[in-house]
Regions:
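Sec/SRP-type N-terminal targeting helices
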Residues: 38-39, 55, 101-129, 179, ...
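Transmembrane beta-barrel architecture of outer-membrane proteins
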Residues: 23-25, 46, 90-92, 138, ...
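Bacterial Sec-pathway N-terminal export signals of envelope proteins
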Residues: 1-50, 147, 175, 228-258, ...
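A short glycine-centered flexible hinge/capping loop motif at secondary-structure junctions
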Residues: 171-178, 379-383, 420-424
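Periplasmic alpha-helical coiled-coil/stalk elements that build and connect Gram-negative outer-membrane
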Residues: 107, 116, 123-239, 350, ...
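Acidic, low-complexity, intrinsically disordered peripheral segments
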Residues: 219, 230-231, 402-431
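Small/polar, glycine/serine/threonine/aspartate-rich low-complexity segments that form flexible
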Residues: 1-19, 28, 66-96, 219-236, ...
Length: 431
C-alpha cells in the first residue's frame, strides 16, 4: 500500500472515521431507540418461533390426559342385567402419541424454508439498521452544512451592507451613480431570501434526527458545536469485489430464494402418501382403588396411510404456484444484485467527481483570498478604495459557500457509498 493510499475502513463503524463525537452519540441513540429497528427485531422473534414450530413437527407429540366421568344408562333402552349397574363411574389416565413419518421430505422442506425465512428476516433487520445509521449520518451532515451556510450568509450580508452604505455615500456625493447602490441592495435581498429556506432545512434535519433516535422533535436538540464532516481522502477498499457478501438485501434475497425452493419441494411431496403412527397407553377402571392395577391397563397402536387420489388438480396447481413464486424471487434476486452494483458505481463516481470539484474550489478560494489581501493592502496604502477590498472579501465568501456545499455533497455521497456497500453484517453478532 502506498503512502498516499487511504487506510482500510472498518465498515462496522464507518461513521467513526469522521471523528465527530456528536455523530457517534446520535448513532448510538438510533441503534438503541429507533422504533423501526425495534419492530424489525420483534419480527425476528416471530419468525424464529415459527421455525421452532416447523422443527417440532418432525418429531412425535406426546400428550398426557386424564378424565373422570359418572353416568347413568337409560332403563328403557338398556334394561339388561348383563350391562352392569345403571349408574357407573369411569376413571381414565394415559398418554397419547402421534407422529407423521416424513418419508418424502414434506416436513423437512418446510423446516428448511422456515430456517431460510429466519435468516432472511435477520438480514432484513441488518439492512434496516444500515439504512437508519446512514440516515442519521446524512441528516447530521445536512445540519452541520446548513449551519455553516447560515454563518457564511450572515457574513456575506454584512459585507454587502457595508458596500451598500459606501455606494450610498458615493452616490449622494455625486462620485458614483445610483446604479451600484440599487444593484448591491438587490444582492442583499437575494442573500436574505436564502436564509429562511436554509433555516427550514435545518429544522427538517433536526426533526428527522429526533425521529431516527426515538425522541420527540419538540424536545430534541443537538448539543455541542461541530464542523461540516470531512470526507476527503476517505474511501473504502475492495470495491465492489466483496459487495455480494456484504449487502444484507442481497443475502436476504438469497435466503428468500432458498425458502421458495424448499416450499416447492414440500408442495411436490403432497403427491405422495402420508404415513402416520399413533398410539396410546393408559389405565381405565370403574373404581378408584382399581385404577392402577395391571388388569386396568389399556393400549393401542394405529399405523395410518393417506394417499391423494382425486383432487381435480389442486395439488398440481399448488406446485405451479410455488414454482412461479420461486422464479419470481429468482428474478428479484438478480434485480437486487444489479441495483446494488449500480448504486456503488454511481456513489463512487459522485464521490470522486466531488473531490475534484473541491480541489478546484480550494484553489479558487486561495486565489480570491490572496486577491483580497492585495486589495486590502492597496486600500491601506491609499491606492484603492475600501469598496474594492470589500468586493474581494465577498468574492471569497461566495466561493467559501460553494466549498461548504461541495463538501456537503461529498459527505452525502460517501455516506451513500457506505450504505450501498451494506456494512459488515458479521459485526452485528448473533440475532
Amino acid at each position: 500500500m502506498g503512502s498516499n493510499d487511504p487506510e482500510p475502513v472498518n465498515l462496522c463503524v464507518w461513521w467513526k472515521q469522521f471523528k465527530d463525537p456528536t455523530l457517534d452519540t446520535l448513532v448510538e441513540k438510533a441503534f438503541a431507540n429507533n422504533f423501526d429497528l425495534l419492530q424489525a427485531f420483534e419480527r425476528i422473534r416471530q419468525v424464529r418461533a415459527y421455525y421452532n414450530i416447523q422443527t417440532a413437527n418432525l418429531f412425535p407429540s406426546l400428550d398426557f390426559n386424564g378424565t373422570f366421568s359418572r353416568y347413568a344408562t337409560s332403563q328403557n333402552l338398556f334394561d339388561s342385567p348383563f350391562l352392569g349397574p345403571r349408574i357407573q363411574n369411569l376413571f381414565q389416565l394415559g398418554f397419547d402419541v402421534n407422529w407423521e413419518i416424513d418419508l418424502f421430505g414434506r416436513l423437512r422442506n418446510l423446516k428448511a424454508a422456515a430456517q431460510a425465512d429466519l435468516i432472511a428476516t435477520k438480514d432484513d433487520y441488518i439492512s434496516l439498521m444500515v439504512t437508519v445509521l446512514a440516515d442519521v449520518a446524512r441528516n447530521y451532515t445536512l445540519y452541520r452544512a446548513f449551519e455553516k451556510k447560515g454563518e457564511n450568509l450572515k457574513r456575506q450580508i454584512q459585507v454587502k451592507k457595508t458596500i451598500n452604505d459606501l455606494n450610498r455615500s458615493l452616490a449622494k456625493s455625486g462620485l458614483e451613480s445610483w446604479d451600484l447602490f440599487y444593484l448591491t441592495r438587490a444582492q442583499i435581498r437575494a442573500l436574505e431570501a436564502k436564509v429562511p429556506p436554509l433555516q427550514m432545512q435545518m429544522e427538517y434535519a433536526v426533526n428527522r434526527l429526533a425521529v431516527l433516535t426515538g425522541e420527540q422533535p419538540e424536545f430534541f436538540t443537538i448539543k455541542g458545536e461541530g464542523d461540516i464532516l470531512k470526507a476527503r481522502g476517505l474511501i473504502p477498499l475492495n470495491i465492489p469485489s466483496k459487495l455480494l457478501q456484504r449487502r444484507p438485501d442481497i443475502r436476504k434475497k438469497e435466503r428468500e430464494l432458498a425458502a421458495a425452493t424448499h416450499r416447492t419441494a414440500a408442495a411436490v411431496a403432497d403427491f405422495f402418501p402420508t404415513f402416520s403412527l399413533s398410539g396410546s397407553y393408559g389405565w381405565e377402571a370403574s373404581r378408584f382403588f382399581k385404577w392402577f392395577r395391571p388388569e386396568s391397563s389399556s393400549w393401542d397402536i394405529t399405523p395410518g396411510l393417506a394417499l391423494p387420489l382425486i383432487n381435480f388438480g389442486r395439488i398440481q396447481s399448488q406446485v405451479q404456484i410455488k414454482a412461479a413464486e420461486q422464479k419470481e424471487v429468482f428474478y428479484a434476486y438478480q434485480a437486487v444484485v444489479l441495483k446494488a452494483l449500480e448504486e456503488v458505481e454511481n456513489n463512487l463516481f459522485t464521490y470522486m467527481q466531488q473531490q475534484g470539484r473541491i480541489a478546484t474550489l480550494e484553489l479558487e478560494y486561495k486565489d480570491f483570498l490572496e486577491n483580497q489581501a492585495l486589495a486590502l493592502s492597496r486600500f491601506t496604502s491609499g491606492l484603492s478604495p475600501l469598496v474594492e477590498a470589500l468586493n474581494q472579501e465577498w468574492n471569497y465568501l461566495n466561493v467559501e459557500y460553494e466549498w461548504i456545499e461541495a463538501n456537503q455533497v461529498l459527505s452525502e455521497s460517501l455516506i451513500a457509498l457506505y450504505k450501498s456497500l451494506g456494512g459488515e453484517w458479521e459485526c452485528f453478532g448473533t440475532l
